[in-house]
Amino acid sequence: MKFAVIVFPGSNCDADMYHAVKDALGEEVDYLWHTETSVEGYDAILLPGGFSYGDYLRSGSIARFSPIMEDVIRAANEGVPVLGVCNGFQVLLEAGLLPGAMLRNEKLTFICKPVELEVQNNDTFFTSEYEQGETITIPVAHGEGNYYCDDETLKQLEANNQVVFRYTDRVNGSRNHIAGIVNKAGNVLGMMPHPERAVEQLVGGEDGLRLFKSILRNWRESHVVTP
C-alpha cells in the first residue's frame, strides 16, 4: 500500500505522519509538496497537522486552494481514503469534504496533552481495529479545535453514525464532544487528536497505530485478487 503525506508551507506534523506509516506500519509513503497537481498512484492520502500558510485568514482556508487540493478532492470523491489530522481536518472542512467549521477553543488557550476518546463507530475504513465503545488515549495539540456545526448538520452526523471519535471530557468546547467525523461515504476522516503521535510505547502508547492498521487492513481486503 502506498501513502501520500501532503506538505503545505507551515505543516509541522508531516514527519510524524511519515514515520507512523514507514516505520511503525511498515508501508510505502511519499511526501507530496502543495504545488504538485496529482495524487494519482496513491492508495491513501494524509493531510498532517501544523499551521498551513501561517493559519492566516483562518486555519486551513488558504491551504484549501493549494494546487494539490483539487486532485485530493477528486480522489476523495472517487473513494480514495483521506485522513486529515488537526490542521488537516481544518483543511478538509474548508474544502467542503466534511461538514462544519472550527472555532477557537472555548477557553482561548492552546491545548497540548493526551486526551481520552471514545470510539463511536468502529465500522469504518479507519477504525475497524478498535472495539465499539472502547476508550483510547491520543494526544491533542491545537488552539482552534472547537468543532461547530448547525443543529441540522449535527442531527445528521449523529443519525448517520458519522461521529467516529468523541472526547470523554469537555476538552475544547466541541459540539457533542466531537473529536472526529467521517463523510457519508466513510472514506474521509477528519480528527483533531494526533494518532501519528501514538504509534509507539516509547512515546506513550500505540492507540493511534491501530488507526493506520485499520486503513491497511481494509485496503488489503478490498484489493484481494481471487483466481
Swiss-Prot record:
Function: Part of the phosphoribosylformylglycinamidine synthase complex involved in the purines biosynthetic pathway. Catalyzes the ATP-dependent conversion of formylglycinamide ribonucleotide (FGAR) and glutamine to yield formylglycinamidine ribonucleotide (FGAM) and glutamate. The FGAM synthase complex is composed of three subunits. PurQ produces an ammonia molecule by converting glutamine to glutamate. PurL transfers the ammonia molecule to FGAR to form FGAM in an ATP-dependent manner.
Active site annotation, chain numbering: C86, H194, E196
Pathway, per record: Purine metabolism; IMP biosynthesis via de novo pathway; 5-amino-1-(5-phospho-D-ribosyl)imidazole from N(2)-formyl-N(1)-(5-phospho-D-ribosyl)glycinamide: step 1/2
The Glutamine amidotransferase type-1 domain, residue ranges: 3-225
Organism: Halalkalibacterium halodurans (strain ATCC BAA-125 / DSM 18197 / FERM 7344 / JCM 9153 / C-125)
Record-annotated membrane-spanning stretches: none
Gene Ontology CC terms, in alphabetical order: cytoplasm
Pfam family, one: GATase_5
Catalytic function, reaction form: N(2)-formyl-N(1)-(5-phospho-beta-D-ribosyl)glycinamide + L-glutamine + ATP + H2O = 2-formamido-N(1)-(5-O-phospho-beta-D-ribosyl)acetamidine + L-glutamate + ADP + phosphate + H(+); L-glutamine + H2O = L-glutamate + NH4(+)
Domain of life: Bacteria
Protein name listed in UniProt: Phosphoribosylformylglycinamidine synthase subunit PurQ
GO molecular function terms attached to this record: ATP binding; glutaminase activity; phosphoribosylformylglycinamidine synthase activity
Claim: Coiled coil is one of the keywords in the record: no
EC number: 6.3.5.3, 3.5.1.2
Subunit structure: Part of the FGAM synthase complex composed of 1 PurL, 1 PurQ and 2 PurS subunits.
Cross-referenced InterPro entries: Class_I_gatase-like (IPR029062), PRibForGlyAmidine_synth_PurQ (IPR010075)
Main location: cytoplasm
Keywords: ATP-binding, Cytoplasm, Glutamine amidotransferase, Hydrolase, Ligase, Nucleotide-binding, Purine biosynthesis
Compartmental location: Cytoplasm
GO biological process: 'de novo' IMP biosynthetic process
Database matches in SUPFAM superfamilies: Class I glutamine amidotransferase-like (SSF52317)
Protein's UniProt keywords contain ATP-binding: yes
CDD domains for this protein: GATase1_FGAR_AT (cd01740)
Lineage: Bacteria, Bacillati, Bacillota, Bacilli, Bacillales
